[in-house]
Design a protein with these regions (language model features):
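A short acidic, Gly/Pro-enriched loop at the edge of an enzyme's catalytic core
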Residues: 102-111
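Conserved SAM/SAH-binding beta-strand->alpha-helix loop
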Residues: 74
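A short glycine-rich, Lys/Arg-flanked "PGG" loop and its adjoining helix->strand segment in the class I
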Residues: 126-138
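Class I SAM-dependent methyltransferase Rossmann-like catalytic core
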Residues: 3-36
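Conserved SAM-binding strand-loop segment of SAM-dependent methyltransferases
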Residues: 88-97
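Conserved beta-strand signature within the Rossmann-like core of class I S-adenosyl-L-methionine
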Residues: 139-146
């Protein structure tokens, strides 16, 4: 069985936690990591690691001294990525993004997220977005991929400067780039 088919089956089986039927496209990977700076991004936090597609792209865009902390609720996905990505900059945490702040002891340069906000409660969404905003350094980004524009207003209420991009793919993938300016 091909890797792509295995991934599709794994994602479909876990649809409520992945929010996707397949891995993100190369275009999404490039766009969502656009604001990671090789010079200034020292700490990047990823929500929803899945099988590590975005994780690999994030690592490609980080400098050698940077750290990536990736959160994933699915133990099998954590094991898979731990077995397939060998990079000292990567720390994998098998926990919900709701709890991310208890693992941090410094400000964050970038958040990269693919978690399905459509399947989270209002309380969970509020906790994640508000704590992410508080944890971000000034002029830093929270970038999110979703299959709908529906949640964009939730991001606009919290972040200072917001942009939504439709990459014209099928299924439709939207990238939200949300910046903390202060």
């Amino acid at each position: 069985m091909s890797t792509k088919l295995k991934t599709t089956l794994a994602f479909t089986k876990n649809l409520l936690t992945t929010g996707a039927f397949t891995e993100t496209s190369k275009n999404v990977e490039k766009e969502i990591t656009r604001f990671i700076s090789l010079d200034t991004s020292k700490l990047v936090v990823e929500f929803g690691m899945g099988h590590g597609n975005l994780t690999r792209e994030i690592l490609k865009n980080m400098c050698p001294e940077s750290k990536l902390i990736s959160f994933e609720v699915n133990k099998d996905f954590c094991s898979y990525v731990g077995d397939t990505i060998s990079d000292n900059r990567l720390t994998i945490i098998n926990d919900s993004a709701v709890n991310f702040s208890k693992y941090l002891d410094e400000k964050v340069d970038n958040f990269i997220s693919s978690i399905p906000f459509s399947f989270l409660t209002k309380e969970e969404t509020s906790i994640i977005l508000n704590e992410a905003y508080t944890s971000l350094k000034s002029n830093s980004y929270f970038s999110q991929v979703l299959y709908t524009r529906f949640n964009f207003k939730k991001f606009q209420k919290i972040f200072d400067d917001n942009e939504i991009i439709n990459l014209g793919s099928f299924p439709t993938e939207y990238i939200y780039h949300c910046r903390k300016t202060s």
